[in-house]
Amino acid sequence: VSARYLAAAEKAGVKPLTTHRLSALRALMSTGSPLSEEGFDYVWRDIKPGIHLQSMSGGTDIISCFVLGNPWQPVNRGEIQGAGLGMDVAVYNEAGQPVVGEKGELVCRQSFPSMPVGFWNDTEDQQKYRAAYFEGFDNVWTHGDYAEQTANGGWIIYGRSDTVLNPGGVRIGTAEIYRQVEQVDEVLECVAVGQEWDGDIRIVLFVRLRDEATLDEALQARIRQIIRHGASPRHVPALMEQVLDIPRTLNGK
């Protein structure tokens, strides 16, 4: 199931643990977007305590996952368990060095079994293909995910690199903001963008609310407080706007 579906189910008060017999359910897989720590809590509290919860990250283009679940390893709250078989995965900083415990670019350092070999109707020297995956670091597949490898071997995805915000020169993954805003009952969904403003970048947050809710000053203050407390003052949006809907890609992201 998608991480967004789990978040929506939690907000709707859905508790399969109390309405269904789930003794045969052994594992639950989450994909589509990063599963928040609160999403892990919801599954273990209201769906099935102790179930093997597998978040994952990959892509249609590779027909696979770079990082995913492993039935033989423990599951840590908010983390993906490990790298896929045949995937030489790492997180690179801006200098192209592998780092642990720091945020950076998710990369694969060697070819892998399901790696596409090119694009249809590309140039002879594969300009589009190389621009899509190999411009970031020389001969290293850069997948476009803003990620972190934890000290215990787990992985955290903070969102797509092309959606990373940079207010005051500090890189912020949009998922870091969404994880906090999802806690607000009045908010159905949201999207954060960076806007050039007075020589810097400011964060603008668009929110879709429940029908009876209004983005008044009190609700804005509560959202800002939750973001400030759960993330940092840097994550707090400079501007919030209420919208009727949020644009999506063809596959619902």
Label each region the model flagged.
Residues A24, E186-E189, D245:
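Glycine-centered tight turns that cap/initiate beta-strands
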Residues H229-K253:
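AMP-binding/adenylate-forming catalytic domain of the ANL superfamily
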Residues A83-G84, Q97-F134, I172:
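Conserved ATP/PPi-binding loop(s) of AMP-dependent carboxylate-activating enzymes
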Residues F112, N139, G144-H235:
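AMP-binding/adenylate-forming catalytic core of the ANL superfamily
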Residues I80-G86, W141:
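Short coil-to-beta-strand transition motifs
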Residues Q54, A90, M240-V243:
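General small-molecule cofactor/ligand-binding pocket signal
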Residues A90-V91, E148, P247:
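Hydrophobic beta-strand positions
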Residues A8-V75, D88, A95-G96, W120-E124:
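Gly/Ser/Thr-rich phosphate-binding loop
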